Design a protein with these regions (language model features):
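Conserved MFS/SLC helix-loop-helix module at the cytosolic interface between two early adjacent transmembrane helices
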Residues: 59-98
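Helix-breaking motifs and short loop linkers at transmembrane-helix boundaries and internal kinks
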Residues: 40, 72, 93-99, 110, ...
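Helix-loop-helix hairpin linking two adjacent transmembrane segments in secondary transporters
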Residues: 137-186
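Helix-to-loop junctions at the C-terminal end of transmembrane segments
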Residues: 60-72, 265-279
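Cytoplasmic helix-loop-helix junction between adjacent transmembrane helices
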Residues: 103-142
Length: 421
């Protein structure tokens, strides 16, 4: 089955907006050292800048999904693009910590509907068998926005300064949102977003959360991306520069490695998900165990690591990030179209909830383990702080195993038996 005419143009415009959203989302990660000086804060304060953004993103997932079900993807994603641009403009001009928190909240709120809107457009425009691969392709292209943050944003920031860097991001965000407004639409036969009226918000939320397959999606999304997010969104550059003794250029290069690994992992994950739908949970578990091993090997050493080992570590974390999108594939499998937006939002909360927990844990442990007033941290302090990430990892692993058992029971009730590996 071929996609309708115009599908590629719509997909390109939507992905461009998601690409810019990822640049907005990750821009603070390359500015962590500068943010400590600009806002006169310490580790917990710096963590709060990232947490405010990610927590708002997570909190807005279900409302954004409900708006998506009612209004369609175009309106909500364009509104999101404009909000993010306003947030970056505020970041450009303020040196107030309180206003910076507000700016990051705007960015998180604007970012919230973008990916699930692109996923809805893909499901509407393309044949079902192509959807998992195209959603992973969306993630791959979006991850290149993280590459832009690691290289281009870092270059502008270090060359021209804080205000020009964030001002440029604001202008680009408005331009891309305007371009998407002209190109993004639903197929003519699907202009009415759903054939059935959307459920009320909390009816849809309860129905989504009550479905074991959706809970498996939530916990899969919770478990897999937070390690990469903690490194890319905030703590990677300070760790590489102050604890591992790397230059800012080398730290940016390590974030590039993380991003490229994610981009290479995305299409492979999409193909495996499409070809082996009954093995999706094993993909999640394999990724989680590999990521845990990478952390253990890094944190076991009490001295700075050679660049190649840091690069391998970043590659493993980056490759695990796109596995989180398997969670959204569970939502598509277990949710009717009338509440797919809410179900996708519910699942998408998982990874960003674990990211909030992870970023806060690292910041809190760093501040407790370091001398009062410290604004840079030692390797031993970072080792202790990163070890705290075992907590969300264990919670996520238990969640995946339990919800997988319940999901397989539901499948068995429908006559579908998952064979042993």
């Amino acid at each position: 089955v071929r996609a309708p005419r115009g599908a590629t143009a719509v997909f390109a415009a939507a992905v461009a907006l998601y690409f810019v959203a990822v640049v907005h989302r990750t821009s603070l990660g390359v500015a962590g050292v500068e943010a400590l000086d600009r806002f006169g804060t310490q580790a917990t304060g710096l963590a709060m800048l990232s947490v405010a953004q990610v927590a708002m993103y997570a909190a807005m997932q279900i409302p954004a999904g409900h708006l998506l079900d009612r209004l369609g993807p175009k309106r909500v994603m364009i509104a999101g693009g404009v909000l993010m641009a306003f947030g970056q403009a505020a970041m450009a001009v303020t040196d107030s910590f309180a206003l910076a928190i507000v700016a990051r909240v705007l960015i998180g709120a604007g970012d919230a509907p973008v990916f699930i809107s692109v996923s809805r457009l893909v499901a509407a425009w393309f044949p079902p068998r192509r959807v998992p691969v195209l959603v992973q392709l969306t993630g791959l292209l979006g991850q290149s926005g993280q590459l832009v943050s690691a290289v281009a944003v870092a270059w502008v920031l270090h060359g021209l300064g804080w205000t020009p860097a964030f001002s440029v991001l604001a202008v680009i965000g408005l331009v891309v949102a305007g371009a998407a407004a002209f190109r993004v639409r639903m197929p003519e036969a699907r202009e009415q977003v759903t054939t059935a009226a959307p459920d009320r918000l909390w009816v849809a939320v309860r129905a989504s959360a009550a479905t074991a397959g959706n809970r498996l999606g939530f916990w899969s999304h919770f478990l897999t991306p937070f390690s990469a997010n903690v490194v890319a969104l905030l703590w990677g550059v300070p760790f590489f520069v102050t604890a591992q003794g790397r230059s800012t250029g080398e730290a940016s290069a390590l974030l590039v490695v993380l991003t490229i690994a994610a981009m290479l992992s995305s299409p492979v994950t999409g193909v495996l998900t499409a070809r082996h739908p009954l093995r999706r949970s094993w993909i999640v578990l394999g990724s989680a165990l590999t990521t845990a091993l990478a952390w253990v090997l890094l944190l076991a050493a009490s001295t700075p690591r050679p660049f190649w080992q840091l690069a391998v570590f970043c590659a493993v974390l980056g490759a695990g990030g796109p596995i989180s999108l398997v969670g959204l594939d569970f939502a598509r499998s277990w949710s009717p179209s009338a509440r797919l937006g809410v179900a996708s939002g519910y699942v998408n909360i998982g990874g960003f909830a674990s990211t909030v927990i992870g970023v806060l844990l690292v910041g809190l442990v760093l501040e407790l383990a370091s001398p009062a007033g410290a604004s840079s941290y030692t390797l031993d302090e970072f080792r202790l702080a990163f070890a705290a990430l075992a907590l969300p990892w264990i919670v996520g692993l238990v969640g995946v195993l339990r919800s997988r058992r319940l999901t397989r029971a539901d499948l068995a009730a429908d006559g579908v038996i998952v064979p042993p590996v």
